């Protein structure tokens, strides 16, 4: 929920600021540290399906009672076992795509296909030894369970004079990581995330009819579920959005041209010139924030934090509000403070994770 809250703020920034000053949006790709860290010598991994065969699931939905005068026409929820074979394949494919391990081997056939009743069970050390030896790997990542909660909702959208048919699936995979030399799993992951589909129609029946078919929904939900644990296991590339001030003076406008030409050093010189050459706190704040983005692009996160802090303090002076003391301040009151504060928080988080990321990437001699 916090993620969507921040994104909503960013959208509001553009509306609040664009009328009185120029902002330009750029994209940035950066590597995010994983929750887990593995020794560099662990280079070959097997992704296995440690479950029994997935039963032929049919959605047995429980329909909710809808309140009177509600825009919701109908809502039903079902709980099902997800297809772990599909999830295992998706997990292996996504881990291989990150190019972190030298080799990724997949064993998507259910290891406990002979179980008479579906159950969750950890691998014994003997089983781990045998799997690692047979597959020629250093560690085992096992998909051991997958639960799905599917909610189907049909509602009337008054502002668009139409009906929406939506399917929201929350996926709960269970993944365990095994090392041959350990008698118990190294760790157990219980991540979760949601995937969403929607269709529209002139009537409730039309919207419901156009909703994603159950078979396709279960397939795509299982594929999605397989990708959920990846960021906990290996470093992943993340795409972010940054904002640059591009107006207010000739150097700032010229610097924006350099950014479009990917000449960041030239842009930095002009931003620094703008920062040092003005007494206007607003212009200093704009230049400081741009310089923070420059240092982030150069992977100098400590310096990026330093300049973002300067921008935040200047924004606080400009807007004569201190959000930490005035909990009723809104984005309309302090748009620059919110913009600089959100960016500073993200930079600090990135910088705090840098030692862990460097340790995780030491297998590549810090070449990342």
Residue ranges, per PLM feature:
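Long, contiguous interaction/recruitment modules in multidomain scaffold/adaptor proteins
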Residues: 86-95, 101-247
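C-terminal/domain-edge helix-coil "capping" segments
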Residues: 21-42, 178-284, 291, 297-368
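N-terminal segment of the mature soluble domain
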Residues: 51-142, 182-187, 320-322, 326-360, ...
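C-terminal motif of bacterial Sec signal peptides marking the signal peptidase cleavage site
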Residues: 16-19
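Short secondary-structure boundary/capping segments
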Residues: 2-3, 61-64, 157-158
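Conserved hydrophobic helix-helix packing surfaces used for dimerization/oligomerization
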Residues: 44-47
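Bacterial N-terminal signal peptides that target proteins for export
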Residues: 1-9
């Amino acid at each position: 929920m916090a993620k969507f809250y921040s994104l909503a703020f960013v959208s509001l920034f553009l509306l609040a600021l664009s009328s009185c000053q120029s902002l330009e949006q750029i994209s940035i790709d950066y590597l995010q540290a994983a929750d887990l860290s593995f020794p560099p010598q662990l280079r070959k991994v097997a992704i296995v399906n440690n479950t029994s065969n997935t039963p032929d699931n049919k959605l047995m939905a429980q329909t909710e009672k809808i309140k009177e005068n509600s825009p919701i026409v109908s809502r039903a929820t079902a709980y099902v076992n997800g297809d772990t074979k599909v999830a295992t394949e998706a997990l292996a494919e996504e881990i291989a795509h990150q190019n972190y391990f030298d080799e990724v081997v997949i064993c998507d056939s259910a290891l406990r296909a002979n179980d008479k009743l579906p159950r969750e069970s950890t691998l014994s050390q003997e089983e781990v030894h045998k799997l690692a030896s047979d597959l020629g790997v250093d560690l085992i990542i096992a998909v051991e369970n997958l639960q799905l909660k599917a909610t189907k909702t049909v509602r009337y959208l008054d502002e668009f004079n139409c009906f929406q048919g939506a399917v929201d699936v929350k996926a709960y995979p269970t993944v365990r990581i095994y090392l041959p030399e350990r008698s118990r799993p190294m760790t157990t992951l219980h991540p979760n995330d949601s995937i969403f589909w929607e269709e529209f129609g002139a009537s409730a029946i039309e919207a419901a009819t156009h909703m994603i078919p159950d078979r396709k929904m279960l397939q795509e939900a299982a594929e999605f579920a397989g990708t959920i644990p990846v960021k906990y296991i290996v470093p992943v590339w993340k795409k972010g959005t940054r904002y640059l001030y591009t107006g207010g003076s000739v150097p700032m406008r010229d610097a924006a041209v350099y950014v479009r030409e990917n000449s960041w050093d030239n842009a930095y010189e002009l931003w620094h010139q703008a920062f040092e050459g003005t007494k206007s706190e607003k212009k200093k704040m704009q230049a400081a924030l741009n310089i923070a983005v420059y240092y982030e692009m150069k992977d100098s996160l400590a310096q990026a934090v330093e300049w973002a802090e300067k921008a935040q303090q200047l924004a606080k002076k400009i807007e004569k509000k201190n959000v930490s003391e005035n909990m009723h301040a809104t984005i309309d009151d302090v748009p620059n403070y919110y913009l600089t504060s959100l960016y500073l928080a993200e930079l600090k988080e990135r910088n705090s994770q840098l030692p862990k990321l460097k340790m995780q990437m030491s297998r590549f001699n810090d070449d990342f």
